[in-house]
Amino acid sequence: MKRISAVMGITAALAAGALVVAGCSSQGGRVASSDDDSSGGTSKGSGLTIALVTHAAPGDTFWDIVRKGAEDAAKKDGVKLLYASDPDGSKQAQLVQQYTDQNVDGIAVSLAKPDALKSSVQAAEKAGIPVVSFNSGSDAYSALGILAHFGQDESVAGEAVGNELEKQGLSKPICVIQEQGNVALEARCGGIKKVLPDTETLYVNGTDNSAVQSTVTAKLQADSDADVVVGLGAPYTAVILKAVKAAGSDIKVASFDLNASLAKSIKSGDVLFTVDQQPFMQGYESIDSIVLYKQGGFVLGGGKPTLTGPAIVDSSNIGKVLQYAEDGLR
């Protein structure tokens, strides 16, 4: 493979659900029943119950990959995995509190809105429940007393995109944020802007794809200076591609994250490249790290985030990656 250029060294995984607890969505794109539990059916189990709590919005299939990693780890370790999600920070905090009240053995939580989650996370820790974070919150987790974090540095990922765009002669991106106030998404656009100062941020309602498309279409029709539009998630980049077509624009498209559809768009040339944070690893390591902590007091990362990305995926390496994307691993 020519490259899956890990812009920062990716820490190797040391090995990677579902009770819905009042979340507006049991997960991203896949719908689960109210008592869906993914313990994996192993005969030799750790006997642990671990909750995975994300900020997934309904229909966002990115989180299916995170959950796949968590489920595989749970199956390997004989863990009963509980899952719930809500994109609203205060409601996500309520989910954490409900799992604390259930006295689970561990909680893995995404920290898109750390201020909203602070009290519930610290309540879990006070109750003696180990908490790890993943995906969002690499700059916030340690201040909350969280044991470990698995994800990518979103500012560095943004800079990687900016550098890649600059290499291709592009200098005026539109960075489309689908969830205002999400610290990870803001950091991505901030990283791009650090490299390319003419970057413009466009906020859209990520819970309504038709609204996303119409907002981006209108922006493209009104803005003739932009030379590339950047989606901050694979499902949203798919909508952006529709908006580009509807606007009759020849603007370039780049992305963050990956799924099978986006992989095919990179292969076809419709999307220049994406930055993959390898969400399967985030889910897998989050569950496995809690098991390791419970069984031996092990803590990964040495006080630093365990990095799962960023890795550039483009035409040079998509042939290798596409197979894994189609299998739901990338």
List where the protein language model places each region.
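Short, solvent-exposed amphipathic alpha-helices that sit
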Residues: 61-77, 157-161, 183-199, 215, ...
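Bacterial lipoprotein signal-peptidase II cleavage site
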Residues: 21-42
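Hinge/cleft segment of the Venus flytrap/periplasmic-binding protein
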Residues: 46, 195-199, 284-330
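Secretory targeting and sorting signals
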Residues: 1-28
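Hydrophobic alpha-helical
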Residues: 93, 109-125, 192, 206-264
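Extracytoplasmic "Venus flytrap"
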Residues: 43, 47-73, 77, 82-98, ...
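Flexible loop/hinge segments that line or gate small-molecule binding clefts
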Residues: 115-156, 259-267, 271-272, 322-324
